Amino acid sequence: MSINGNAAASKLYISDVTLRDGSHAIRHQYSVPQVRQIALALDEARVDSIEVAHGDGLQGSSFNYGFGAHTDVEWIEAVADVVKHAKIATLLLPGIGTVHDLQAAYNAGARIVRVATHCTEADVSRQHIELARKLDMDTVGFLMMSHMSSPQALAEQAKLMESYGATCCYVVDSGGAMNMNDVRDRVLALREVLQPETAIGIHAHHNLSLGVANSIVAVEAGAIRVDASLAGMGAGAGNAPLEVFIAAAERMGWQHGTDLYRLMDAADDIVRPLQDRPVRVDRETLALGYAGVYSSFLRHAEAAGHKYGLKTVDILVELGKRRMVGGQEDMIVDVALDLAQQTTT
């Protein structure tokens, strides 16, 4: 098997997101001991990086997105205390987190930052990417909801991030809405316009049960960094399950550098028991992928459905029709109120 025409000797970069995207699955309530335990297990399994933050990135703890059990800095410091191999990553959404928050995360131990914008708004990432480069951080551009942009338009946005200083750009399937052709086309489009030394990453969600398949196709098209989480812990139906992707990569003959059995143990013994709502494809999470809705809307939509006596699926489908994107969580209640009014008239 080859990776984008190169020998399979190309080692994949395994980026774990259990302690960031996975935070959505438990409404950002990781305790410090839990964070340490998960980080230690991941480090012992030799993943390349461990992303740590509120589910919505630095300073995501808020009324709009949900308050975290701890601050981002507390979580990052907890991971820094135990990891010996993996680099600590964090996520920053311009407009939620600031350059000051990025500096604080760096001081706490983060050495990688993924600067995340909606797939058409890369221009708002400039000052954050430039600061990250000044701090000598591994600087990544993260284009959320990539399914809402054509491959060529997405590539243009990635090129902007590269021009600001990003050394890696991600195709991000925030809604778990893409199929394998969608992913392949976008990765190939990025590879065509980015400099050869600029890496490409894939961040998949499992809402259509395609998280692992999409990650494999992305690697075949030229992606080298792969996001995944233990037991798929993440928003919606979760991310590509890390232990499943690694098993598949092993079968493909790809080098990944991790310990599959340690990952399997960590997924089942440590992470899965934390889920107060099973992270799986079900009626509600399938609706996310089918309607192309931001995966972290799930728990908010469930709460609104319960409050206003509505089906969560109806709320999610309407959000998809209105093309709501990450950062518009406040509109979930507006949509619920509109639907509730329609049922009474």
Curated annotation (Swiss-Prot):
It holds the Pfam family HMGL-like. Its EC number is 4.1.3.39. One of its GO terms (biological process) is L-leucine biosynthetic process. Substrate binds at residues 20-21, 174, 203, 294. Signal peptide: none annotated. It catalyses: (S)-4-hydroxy-2-oxopentanoate = acetaldehyde + pyruvate. Residues 12-264 form the Pyruvate carboxyltransferase domain. InterPro entries: 2-IPM_HCS-like, 4OH_2_O-val_aldolase, Aldolase_TIM, DmpG_comm, DRE_TIM_HOA, PYR_CT. Mn(2+) binds at residues 21, 203, 205. Keywords: Aromatic hydrocarbons catabolism, Lyase, Manganese, Metal-binding. The record marks 20 as: Transition state stabilizer. It is an enzyme of class 4 (lyase). CDD domains: DRE_TIM_HOA. Belongs to the 4-hydroxy-2-oxovalerate aldolase family. This is 4-hydroxy-2-oxovalerate aldolase 2. It comes from Paraburkholderia xenovorans (strain LB400). The gene is amnG.
